[in-house]
């Protein structure tokens, strides 16, 4: 009797454990699926295609890289495939210009479709009237052509603060300098009344003597 009870108990534990394992496996299955990329992440993942789709002087490649084709194909066929339409509608979204014709050609080069307008038709207003929301991104252009660095989001340099120069007036540091001396007064010649009388006397006397001398000289 005890043996039968033990066997039934073991059977119940086995069934319970099997049911718990099945429920746990069912609950863990959805978590193994890869997360869906956001629109911003789709554009960042598109970076291997930039050497091909960038406008001069950033067009460093004449053919797209195999990684570019893989990223483009997976992005176009994903649920957020129209995120790449930002590249066609806003060519300067990454901070530097993109070649529209090369963007459209990726449909023919990287996919099995023969239609060159497949990517363009996907991004048309009729197919994608509204694009998914896009978070703000700052995409740095990694390409350099010759000695010129390609256009990239610029950092704003703030002008340095101007320190007060030594010749500016400062109430705290200014010292009062003595005023300049007044200009010298003009020198005036003063004469006493006696000397003025003598000068007035000699002046007509001289004229008379000169006039008398000239008369005597004529006689």
UniProtKB/Swiss-Prot annotation:
Residues 1-22 form the signal peptide. InterPro entries: Bifun_inhib/LTP/seed_sf, Bifunc_inhib/LTP/seed_store, Plant_LTP_GPI-anchored. It holds the Pfam family LTP_2. Its main location: membrane. Glycans are attached at residues 59, 148. It is found in: Cell membrane. One of its GO terms (cellular component) is plasma membrane. It comes from the Eukaryota. Disulfide bonds join 39-85, 49-68, 69-110, 83-123. Residues 152-181 are annotated as: Disordered. PANTHER family: BIFUNCTIONAL INHIBITOR/LIPID-TRANSFER PROTEIN/SEED STORAGE 2S ALBUMIN SUPERFAMILY PROTEIN (PTHR35747), NON-SPECIFIC LIPID TRANSFER PROTEIN GPI-ANCHORED 25 (PTHR35747:SF2). Probable lipid transfer protein. Belongs to the plant LTP family. This is Non-specific lipid transfer protein GPI-anchored 25. It comes from Arabidopsis thaliana (Mouse-ear cress).
